């Protein structure tokens, strides 16, 4: 019997790098098994290369990101790496890194395995970068796209550099996200390739025509030669130009994917699944019906955004800034109050006790709007507590109301009725805050009364590997 194919998935995240090996598993409901995975902290934060960017600048050192990637791969089992038939790569969207074509990296043969080290490469300016003020953004041309442009988006950053550091841009002739860079270096691509998932995250990209707003950009003096060529997500960018951690030279490498899309792909078994992730923040994503096209003008006040997915479809995504971080704020407040009263209690003890109390308290009239951080579409909204009565003041009541408020806030952004109109039949629940909180699970089931599945955590590295695994299996069948 032929060995089942193995694919490698890599995710280059903001704080960590992850790699996962997947094998086809026809007997498993998911169709795949994770053979091994490894994560390493990137620790890549770097001093900003331009003083003009000020304290809002956020940059990362590419060599540290690659070091974390190499550490991940070195920890994976070598015999399985030798059997890899495809590599999928995803990563943090919106950011931009610049390099010189043909000089972006150098392959070194000295160690146990050939590795590539960055050469004529800038820092990565990340999605968290805040150098583009609202005044600066208002001065930019209006994009011909359904997505608006924000600080930290690749095209906005390039506009900023054009204005404040034009000499910097003259040093480079290629640009992409960090994961586009890795794919280009692995394959020795003469020009970077970019999926529409990452292009849309840069701004000034029209997903309907699958093209950059070249005329709009050119008329504003934008260096359009830096814009990567566009390729379909799920397609092959090229083949590895060297053996790499036992992975054979000539192995297929997929076009880099957005981490949001790869994460959702890892969990969404059917097109009729919605994926709910409650970690620090909250995301609820569903695949839009085929043929759906978003309105062609940006609406920053809309609570749902539409992002390119696969096969020219879109994901509808409600992303709330208020999730597990709100519970953490509440726990911290209680611990602080007790410290003020002369009592010392561990945060972990408070968390487990308050969840226990809320499990016992099945209902409450207390209403908490938990938006302590506002929302992207309502930045000025703060949190509030209403319908307070003397009978609803126990820890159980307050914790139940807080968990309900987190879920109800999400439901107000993307209601169950909307999901059902899109054809959603099941919700896949994931994320650290949801997995360890039975009260949140109960409230999710109350607000979204659909079949629920908990436990399969979203994982962008697994999603990237899965895209390449399914591609390989489809190629074999055809």
Curated annotation (Swiss-Prot):
Principal location listed in the UniProt entry = cytoplasm
Xref: Gene3D superfamilies = 3.30.420.40
Got a GO cellular component term for this one? cytosol
**Under the GO molecular function aspect, what terms does this record hold?**
ATP binding; sedoheptulokinase activity
Functionally, this protein is described as follows: Acts as a modulator of macrophage activation through control of glucose metabolism.
Q: Which family does it belong to?
A: Belongs to the FGGY kinase family.
Q: What is this protein called?
A: Sedoheptulokinase
